[in-house]
Regions:
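Glycine-rich nucleophile elbow surrounding the catalytic serine of serine-hydrolase chemistry
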Residues: 182-194
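C-terminal catalytic histidine-bearing segment of alpha/beta-hydrolase fold enzymes
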Residues: 246, 295, 302-363
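Cap/lid segment of the alpha/beta-hydrolase catalytic domain
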Residues: 85-162, 166-169, 209-218
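N-terminal targeting or regulatory segments adjacent to alpha/beta-hydrolase or S9 domains
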Residues: 1-73, 361
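Conserved strand-to-loop "acid loop" that flanks and positions the catalytic carboxylate
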Residues: 277-294, 339-341
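Mobile cap/lid helix-loop segments that gate and shape the active-site cleft of serine hydrolases
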Residues: 205-272, 297-319
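Proline/glycine-enriched tight loop/beta-turn segments at coil->beta junctions
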Residues: 68-74, 80-90, 112
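Alpha/beta-hydrolase fold nucleophile elbow
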Residues: 173-184
């Protein structure tokens, strides 16, 4: 059933990794800025020592990015083991300025083998069309000038990459096992980050939907040739027309030209996942998150699978039916699972990502 459904979507065939990365930068997310930044870290503060019987500390540092146009500092929080060993790391770009929040179950995370790095995305630059906040004026001192200049997703992704520069200097980091994780718009950001930076061995997308891990062609937000929708209101998936009208500043200006047709003639979102191969990708889709179009997210994983198969690897685990809440496909290098939740980075999701990473951890 799924393979036939995928054929019905009439997706463009995968291209070379270099071509797919170029297309997605030029037409959707924009080109990342030149890395002419210096990084500095200061004022380490221990916030809590009691986690895991004192073996895990929660601390913060002031993280500064500086170039010829100025500097910007934002707090980075670290949940780090103190046992002297090497640990896999999950870098989570977060929605909340408070480190203990609904997206970050800190007590549970502290009891795992993972070191966790987190920070608030709006501390990097604001989530709006203002390109004079945070690192934006350091990248665009005269504002965005070109239709291919990156939007806010690109700036958040660039900051993720600079935080990784720092994380790789920490003694406890296992450099082969570092993941980037984000939810919703930050799930799109995590995927773009992972595509652009091969140092991330794992890329985790949570409910990223339209312009993230959901293919656009034939999605539930689009009518068929007779004007009928596959899913009736209010359960229709988001479209490029909607997202570029409401959140145009997330993307480069070029992306707006696809609003009416809802996809590029020579690309769709399976390119975003495929360009990460041969590294590991895990996509969570939520049972009640119709806006993210769960079926199109699972089909995107299936469409991208060929990129791994061409390299002699297993892409997505074989399945011919859509997932139900609580089900998962974790045997392949593309993992996909469905949490029995709404649009949310839940404990179920965190547990799923950590399980997938344990299965595929690099030695």
């Amino acid at each position: 059933m799924l393979k036939q459904e995928l054929l019905n979507r009439k997706l463009p065939p995968l291209k070379s990794q270099e071509e797919m990365i170029e297309i997605l930068q030029r037409e959707e997310y924009g080109y990342l800025p030149e890395n002419d930044f210096e990084i500095s870290v200061a004022n380490e503060k221990i916030i809590e020592r009691r986690f895991d019987k004192g073996n895990v500390f929660l601390s913060s540092v002031e993280f500064t990015l500086k170039n010829r146009n100025g500097s910007h500092t934002f707090p980075v929080y670290r949940l780090l083991h103190q046992d002297g060993g090497k640990h896999p790391v999950i870098i989570c770009i977060n929605f909340d300025k408070l480190v203990s929040n609904k997206y970050f179950p800190i007590e549970e995370l502290s009891e795992t083998e993972y070191d966790i790095i987190t920070y608030c995305y709006t501390d990097i630059t604001s989530d709006d069309g203002d390109f004079t906040t945070g690192i934006a004026p350091l990248v665009f001192p005269n504002g965005r000038q070109n239709a291919t200049d990156c939007g806010k997703i690109g700036l958040w992704a660039f900051a993720n990459m600079r935080v990784l520069d720092y994380v790789l200097t920490l003694d406890g980091t296992d450099p082969k096992n570092v993941a980037i994780l984000g939810h919703s718009r930050l799930g799109k950001t995590a995927l773009f980050t992972g595509m652009m930076d091969k140092r991330f061995g794992f890329v985790f997308s949570n409910n990223s939907g339209c312009s993230g891990a959901a293919i656009a062609r034939g999605g539930s937000g689009l009518p068929d040739s007779e004007g009928n929708f596959a899913v009736e209101k209010p359960f229709r998936g988001e479209t490029i027309e909607v997202i570029t009208r409401v959140f145009p500043y997330w993307f480069c200006e070029n992306y707006k030209k696809y609003a009416k047709q809802n996809y590029g003639t020579d690309f769709d979102q399976h390119y975003l996942l495929a360009a990460i191969a041969p590294r590991n990708v895990c996509v969570n889709t939520a049972e009640l998150d119709y806006w993210a179009d769960q079926k199109s997210e699972q089909l995107c994983c299936l469409a991208a699978s060929q990129a791994w198969e061409r390299l002699g690897l297993c892409g997505i685990e074989e399945s011919d039916s859509y997932l139900k809440g609580g089900e998962k496909l974790f045997k392949g290098n593309i993992g996909v699972f469905m949490t029995p939740t709404m649009h949310f980075l839940s404990r179920h999701a965190w547990q799923g990502y950590m399980e997938f990473m344990r299965i595929h951890r690099h030695n």
